[in-house]
């Protein structure tokens, strides 16, 4: 099983709060090994966003990296 599918399968069984906790834990720990998992989550969300949501997300990203 590839990493992308493994991450998505694991997250499907989790609640919104559990996923939020996972994201916060990765951010707080600065564990670079978990970065691919965040990328999978981002890609899954991005693929389902409208153009308006993508524009809004890009504003948040730009604010975060500036």
Curated annotation (Swiss-Prot):
Keyword Transcription regulation carried by entry: no
Tell me yes or no: is GTP-binding among this UniProt entry's keywords: no
Which keywords appear in this protein's UniProt record, sorted alphabetically? Sporulation
Localization recorded for this chain is: Spore core
**Which InterPro entries has this protein been placed in?**
SspI
Q: What is this protein called?
A: Small, acid-soluble spore protein I
By sequence similarity, the record places it as follows: Belongs to the SspI family.
Give the record's GO biological process terms.
asexual sporulation; sporulation resulting in formation of a cellular spore
Q: Which Pfam families match?
A: SSPI
Induction field: Expressed only in the forespore compartment of sporulating cells.
């Amino acid at each position: 099983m590839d990493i992308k599918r493994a991450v998505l399968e694991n997250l499907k069984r989790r609640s919104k709060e559990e996923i939020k906790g996972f994201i916060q834990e990765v951010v707080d720990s600065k564990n670079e090994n978990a970065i691919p998992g965040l990328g999978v989550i981002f890609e899954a969300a991005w693929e389902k966003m409208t153009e308006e949501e993508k524009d809004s997300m890009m504003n948040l990203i730009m604010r975060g990296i500036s």
